[in-house]
Amino acid sequence: MSINSELSEITQLLHQDNYSCVVRNGVETQAFSRQGVQDLLSLYEERPEFLYNAMVADKVVGKGAAALMILGKVAGIYAAVISKPALDLLTEHNMYVKYD
């Protein structure tokens, strides 16, 4: 499955079920509802291997979330809203990013 089609699937989940963040790695998908970077930080601390090469769809990506995605070595990111500093940081690290 291509990065675009996988991101499209989890983006649909993000909006359809009103999650704040959806992460997919292979066949496993985890969806979160807390605001801010709490869920992403917990995932990075508890299961960093899950973020490796994962796809992430997030409602709001700021610089902190962007840094966690870089550290986790995610493969692709969709952001409904992204800050300029976050986009600059992700671009600097050659991360694949789609946003509205």
Give the location of each predicted region.
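Short, polar loop motifs at secondary-structure junctions
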Residues: 81-86
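C-terminal binding/interaction regions
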Residues: 72-75, 87-100
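Conserved mixed alpha/beta catalytic, RNA-binding, or beta-rich assembly cores of soluble enzyme
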Residues: 2-80
